Amino acid sequence: MRIVKRGGYAYLFMGSGPGRAFEPTGAAIPVPFSGDFYIGIGLSAHDKDVVEKAIFSNVTLDPLPAGATPVTEKNSALYSTLETVAIDSTIRTIKYVQKARFEAPNWTRDGASFLFNRDGRIWRFPAAVPDPVTAGAQPPPSPEPVAIDTSFATRCNNDHGISPDGTDLVISDNSQDTHDSLVYVLPITGIASGGAPRRITKNSPSYWHGWSPDGKTLAFVGERNGDFDIYTLPASATSSADETRLTTAKGLDDGPEYTPDGKWIYFNSERTGHMQIWRMHPDGSAQEQVTHDEWNNWFPHFSPDGKWMVMLSYDKSVTGHPENKDVQLRLMSMADGKITVLARLFGGQSTINVPSWSPDSKKLAFVSYELLPAETPAK
């Protein structure tokens, strides 16, 4: 095992034997080290009634050499980690780690799989896999993701989702026309087979974000004449249908999502000069600000039971929703509006662009990222 601290993050690596390379386990955790501190290895039984004895052998402490080159995206390898976090305990569980960029998980309606995009395709990955950190010395090999057949749509971006009844997949894809994003719907059977996409939006670029609880309406973001606003179309529409514009304020409006009862569409807007969460009725009326804080808040997502809203929060100094930033997933209680921190991570763009709650409302799926040295040999 190797623990490496770089900047404000601590990384855990696991090796499978002498001479074998250490592989990152994913889920880097920000650790606020400052000044003098002690380092070491500890063991916990996670049970107050259990006393454990452990022997650590072959332990070395190696500081980075003076003048070592800082790790940046240009001189490092990017690792993506699919994680889940429990709402009640904030315990994070690693599901899948890959030396590549994948993005924006959805959790299927039956709870059996995750969907995410990678290299222009949509992939399916089983939800019931052991955490490689807690699975023991010889964890079982991780299964590989399986691509869903999306026919000609091979430039899918990170705005995709699943219909309320679990039978259809909506994608945003850049394969046709001028290669600007368009919204499509395709049938799926158990999130396995796929099919020919049906084009929904006539105009581009358009990016899907929300599906009404009754399955009849899609909400999406479109750039029209230089302004990004929120629009809707029937889920049964074809590319000849006219879209309905819901927002007209100057500045970016993004991330529309319906509440589970269908009474509101929540979204993020910078119309006040500061990105905050807003809401409106499904016809665009009664637009009002929801969050009023010093964070830049993006992408509101609701638990299926309607009790919680999660959002992606950047420091107020960050413009837009870039990748490779220190961010927080923050949880708002819909009962009293109280906001708590659910997870701190390195990510941003692609972490939770789309709905990713578990069907039982107990967990949230997201993607975190790590920038690590391209080679990490074992000693």
What label would you give each PLM region?
Residues M1-P70:
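Extracellular glycan-recognition regions
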Residues A68-K379:
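Sequence signature of WD/YWTD-type beta-propeller architectures
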